[in-house]
Amino acid sequence: MYYGFDIGGTKIALGVFDSGRQLQWEKRVPTPRDSYDAFLDAVCELVAEADQRFGCRGSVGIGIPGMPETEDGTLYAANVPAASGKPLRADLSARLDRDVRLDNDANCFALSEAWDDEFTQYPLVMGLILGTGVGGGLIFNGKPITGKSYITGEFGHMRLPVDALTMMGLDFPLRRCGCGQHGCIENYLSGRGFAWLYQHYYHQQLQAPEIIALYNQGDEQARAHVERYLDLLAVSLGNILTIVDPDLVVIGGGLSNFPAITTQLADRLPCHLLPVARVPRIERARHGDAGGMRGAAFLHLTD
């Protein structure tokens, strides 16, 4: 059995998957925020419960926001303060007496989708998250590409391409990002960025779901906004696709629930790609809230 943990600032979610990659059981508990020992206990108790329930010693994979292992082997995860700065993988491997695998949550999202029954035919899968922020992951032949610093797939911290400034106007604001840089595409293409663009052009403060509702009602202003957003997404994604050249792009996050993202994006890409480039298949993520657990569990499918 494959145990996958999706760990965030408020909850630890465990999903148990069989050899057919089907979910057999899941359980959630609150994330201890102040005590590392309590955090380790919470994970180990869930593993023990799963072992007893299924009569086996399942493999353990963990998805967590942040950098799973820094150069000294410790975790960097600002949203999980009890474990940040600790050698989480090593400590859990020792306590559980088994190989614990750890990766960031965006890579686990991408891995979950790459192992979808229909998507396993594609060698190179790119996961793109358009949610509170912008991120993602790259999966090659069923394995995540992490890079030396575990920042592969941090697409949101690419800067706006020059064509975007031509499109939006050379006086378009280069917003300061939480990473300290200016002009990161996360600030324009995330759910928050989607709302900011609307406010910037129309001087009305609406949230993304409200704008999308207006779009669906045929509101001309909302439709013009969505056209502009999709053009900006296409020119930004075009740069990424030129470097990565994936077979499949799977889009997750809150904005993936807006059908125009996946149905209209492909037609806008060719003018931003090399003439010989082929537009990859673009699909909405299929596994929703279970994706983090699935991807973490499937870290052990990559042997």
UniProtKB/Swiss-Prot annotation:
**Pathway involvement of the protein, from the record:** Cell wall biogenesis; peptidoglycan recycling
Q: Which InterPro entries match?
A: ATPase_NBD, N-acetyl-D-glucosamine_kinase, ROK, ROK_cs
Identify the keywords attached in UniProt to this record, alphabetized: ATP-binding, Carbohydrate metabolism, Kinase, Metal-binding, Nucleotide-binding, Transferase, Zinc
* Entry GO MF terms: ATP binding; N-acetylglucosamine kinase activity; zinc ion binding
Quote the catalytic activity from the record.
N-acetyl-D-glucosamine + ATP = N-acetyl-D-glucosamine 6-phosphate + ADP + H(+)
Residue positions annotated to bind ATP are 4-11, 133-140
Q: Which GO terms describe its biological process?
A: N-acetylglucosamine metabolic process; peptidoglycan turnover
The record's section on SUPFAM superfamilies has: Actin-like ATPase domain
Q: Which Gene3D superfamilies match?
A: 3.30.420.40
Q: Which domain of life is it from?
A: Bacteria
Q: Name one Pfam family in it.
A: ROK
Quote the EC number.
2.7.1.59
Q: Where does Zn(2+) bind?
A: 157, 177, 179, 184
Q: Which NCBIfam families does its entry note?
A: PRK13310.1
> What family does the database annotate?
Belongs to the ROK (NagC/XylR) family. NagK subfamily.
Entry function: Catalyzes the phosphorylation of N-acetyl-D-glucosamine (GlcNAc) derived from cell-wall degradation, yielding GlcNAc-6-P.
Name used for this protein in its record: N-acetyl-D-glucosamine kinase
This chain's source organism reads: Shigella boydii serotype 4 (strain Sb227)
